[in-house]
Design a protein with these regions (language model features):
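Domain-scale detector for complete catalytic domains at protein termini or as standalone homologs
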Residues: 119-132, 146
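Membrane-interfacial terminal anchoring regions of lipid-handling membrane enzymes
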Residues: 1-100, 108-109, 114, 132-133, ...
Length: 446
């Protein structure tokens, strides 16, 4: 980032059937060659087909709440809806109109790293953006409108973003539950009889072959980057742990030595617990960014990361029409503010990727997919420490994978309307908790 940028425009959803047809036909090949996903499965597809048919008949408004371990989840789910669900419905005698699709909610920051193609394509697939870290009235209004009147169900990840772990479910954000209640409110105001239904969807990946040789090769590269002597006698789990043991004290020293003591003093406590040390490191990294962006460290790590991102964006993407008439000095100062905001944002990105270290010491039964995900998160972390942006690099392919979606039992939002009228906050939290439990049960059953 060398200069202040134009303000982020709202990317209005404008579904284009012709673009969708091309994407539907090309997705299987794109997933195979760019993501290594050779197969997509839809388990419990007859449940989804029945609810999709009810949606198309005008009986329900439908929310697809899917687990979000990787950035490949939305394209895989689009493929499952468009190409796998219609044959399942036909076999069960359930009539479905084409196209079978969903309006996906996505983070407004995705086109910033995915590029102009994503900024052009996502709206034409009917996707709707949301800005993290602040009350995005325009984004919420668009999502609320699509949920009420859109031609397709609304699909969203209640975790708020990809967490990189198939076996760890992040705490759910309350926004999806709130959207469900808003939709019920809008239906009642319009005297419409539809019910609001949330379908939980579990997402999981499996390697079709043994990924261990590819993981070992990637770990050798990462060990070289960290100055660690390779030891082929160690297991994958041991090598992952060794990477964490190397990086954690290195980053503790980095923050305690080069940043103000009030922000990093907790790092010197000598607590022997790795997880506690990691949490203190993440807190210190966020405090550095918050201090420089004039923010108070309030809320969870996720809330703090969102606020940091939004504060940095306000300094970077702030150029309006009047900006073209700034003096050279004003222009130079605006560029300086944008450059420094980008530097402060680096600490938040580091926290996002440093969570890789939580996997090796705390999973009693490592799985191939879990070890592969941990290796990839270490790759993302080390890439960022080397000054690269892992989002703009090709992700190492560790083998061919199968993506599977499992449809859970529906959650009826309309039946909770009385609870919402009595206590809105409690009803939203209760619905969020029940959705979390439903996704946890799906995850543990596979």
């Amino acid at each position: 980032m060398q200069a202040v940028q134009p303000a982020l425009a709202f990317l209005e959803p404008q579904f284009d059937p012709w673009v969708f047809r091309v994407v539907r036909l090309g997705l299987p090949w794109w997933l195979r060659w760019t993501k290594g996903i050779r197969e997509v499965r839809l388990e419990g597809g007859e449940i989804l087909a029945e609810w999709m048919a009810q949606f198309q008949r005008g009986q329900v408004r439908l929310i697809l709440a899917y687990r979000h371990p990787t950035t490949a989840d939305p394209p895989c789910l689009i493929h499952a809806l468009a190409n796998l669900l219609p044959p399942i419905a036909q076999a069960k005698g359930i009539p479905l109109r084409q196209p079978v699709h969903a309006h996906f909610m996505y983070d407004r920051g995705i086109p910033l790293w995915a590029g102009a193609v994503a900024a052009w394509l996502l709206p034409r697939l009917g996707a709707t953006p949301i800005v993290r870290g602040r009350l995005d009235r325009q984004g919420l209004k668009a999502a609320r409108s699509l949920l009420l009147d859109g031609p397709f169900p609304l699909a969203a990840a209640p975790e708020g973003g990809a967490n990189g772990h198939s076996d760890i479910l992040n705490p759910l954000e309350p926004g999806l539950a709130q959207l469900g209640f808003w939709c019920q409110e809008d239906l009642l105001k319009a005297h419409r009889p539809e019910q609001v239904i949330i379908l939980p969807i579990h997402t999981r990946y499996q390697y079709l072959g043994d990924p261990e040789p590819a993981i070992a090769k990637l770990l050798t590269r990462l060990e070289q980057d960290c100055g660690i002597q390779a030891d082929s006698g160690l297991s994958i789990r041991e090598r992952l742990s060794r990477l964490g043991e190397q990086l954690l004290p290195q980053m503790e020293q980095f923050y305690s030595q080069f940043f103000p003591k009030p922000l990093t003093q907790a790092l010197g406590s000598g607590d022997p617990e790795v997880l506690e040390r990691l949490q203190r490191l993440l807190d210190s990294a966020l405090r550095v960014a918050e201090f420089n962006l004039n923010l108070q460290p309030q809320g969870s790590l996720i809330d703090r990361r969102h606020r940091i991102e939004q504060a940095a964006w306000e300094r970077i993407y702030c150029l309006d029409e009047a900006g073209n008439r700034q003096s050279p000095v004003e222009w130079g100062l605006a560029n300086r503010i944008a450059q420094e905001a980008q530097l402060h944002l680096w600490h938040m990105r580091l926290v996002e990727t440093f969570l890789a270290m939580t996997y090796p010491p705390h999973s009693p039964a490592p799985t191939p997919i879990g070890e592969a995900e941990s290796a990839l998160r270490f790759w993302a972390l080390i890439s960022r420490l080397k000054g690269q942006d892992p989002l703009k690099l090709p992700t190492p392919q560790l083998g061919c994978r199968r993506a599977s979606f499992t449809i859970g039992d529906p959650v009826n939002v309309s039946q909770r309307w009385g609870d919402y009228q009595r206590n809105r906050r409690q009803a939203v939290q209760s619905l969020t908790d029940d959705l979390q439990q439903a996704l946890m049960q799906l995850m543990h059953s596979h």
